[in-house]
Each structure stands twice: as structure tokens, then as C-alpha cells.
A protein has these predicted regions:
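Conserved class I S-adenosyl-L-methionine
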Residues: 8-18
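Conserved SAM-dependent methyltransferase scaffold
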Residues: 22-23
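Aromatic pocket-lining residues of Rossmann-like dinucleotide-binding sites
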Residues: 26
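Class I S-adenosyl-L-methionine-dependent methyltransferase module
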Residues: 32, 38-162
Length: 163
């Protein structure tokens, strides 16, 4: 639609960006993108994918590898409130421990977004839900251990992200 109706443009504003798929399509074409979403977790994800701040990608890979080996030793907020509901107890315990560890790394804002995005997407893979977080299954049948993956590092220039 855009290619058929707009001649030459350099900037695209996606003000209700949601998953970011449309904005990413234009980012891949070398356009400057402006994104907005009121949901804070989306802001974190967009900072990962569309942010301009330089990151040390090797450091991110190393930290995520370390986070995957986290062996929680005590209960935490996530295990107490979400264990055996939205997540298996062990996954909830590990999620909470990882989330706490992320706060202690010496990283810039975008690097922290990479770590949080990795955790958010890993949580989604092991969640005991049926489409959204208001509807979880009473029987815990999602027992796969949580595993964080390293988000792709996109080269971005002059993008703007709002919440």
C-alpha cells in the first residue's frame, strides 16, 4: 500500500506499534522509524530492536550464557506469586533469580533492554497460559526448562522510541 501511494519518504511513524513487525519492515529498508507504545515491556523490546545506543554484543552474549546457568537457591517474588500457576515452580524461581541478577550488571540502557527482552521472550515460551496471561491452565503441563536466547542486534540510526 505504501509503495503504491507514497513516492519518496525517509521516516515512518508507527504510533500503535504493538509487536513491531510493521516498523521492522521499514527499518530493514533503511528508513528512520518512530515508534510508540504505552506498554513498558514493548518499550523495552523496541529499545532492543530499534534503539540507537551502541552495545557490546559479545558482552550481551556472555551475560545471557551466564544467566542460562543460573541456579536459584531461594524463593523470590516470581516463584512465590507465579510458581505452579503461570510457570512451573522451578522456572518461576529461575525467572525471579535472573530478573534480580539483571539489575546488578554494569550495562547501558540498551544492553539492559537486550537482557530483559531475552528474558521476556523466554518466559513466553514456558508460560502455562492459553493465549494471554489472564487464562492459565490449572494443570501444570509446561515443564520445559526456561532458556534465554540472544536477540538479534540491528544496526539503527536516528530512530525514536516513545512510551
Amino acid at each position: 500500500v505504501v509503495q503504491n501511494n507514497v513516492d519518496d519518504f525517509e521516516t515512518v511513524a508507527d504510533i500503535f506499534v504493538g509487536t513491531g513487525v510493521v516498523a521492522d519492515l521499514f527499518r530493514k529498508q533503511g528508513k528512520k522509524i518512530i515508534v510508540n507504545d504505552i506498554l513498558y515491556s514493548n518499550f523495552v523490546n523496541f529499545n532492543t530492536w530499534f534503539g540507537n545506543e551502541k552495545i557490546d554484543y559479545d558482552k550481551i552474549v556472555s551475560i545471557i550464557n551466564e544467566l542460562n546457568t543460573t541456579a536459584p537457591t531461594s524463593e523470590n517474588y516470581v516463584s512465590l506469586n507465579f510458581g505452579n500457576k503461570y510457570f512451573s515452580y522451578e522456572n518461576a524461581k529461575k525467572i525471579g533469580a535472573i530478573r534480580e541478577k539483571i539489575e546488578h550488571y554494569d550495562v547501558n540502557e540498551r544492553e539492559k533492554s537486550f537482557l530483559l527482552t531475552s528474558l521476556l521472550y523466554a518466559m513466553d515460551k514456558v508460560a502455562n497460559t492459553v493465549g494471554h496471561y489472564d487464562a492459565y491452565r490449572k494443570k501444570m503441563d509446561t515443564l520445559k526448562p526456561i532458556h534465554l536466547r540472544v536477540p538479534e542486534n540491528n544496526k539503527n540510526f536516528q530512530n525514536e522510541i516513545y512510551k
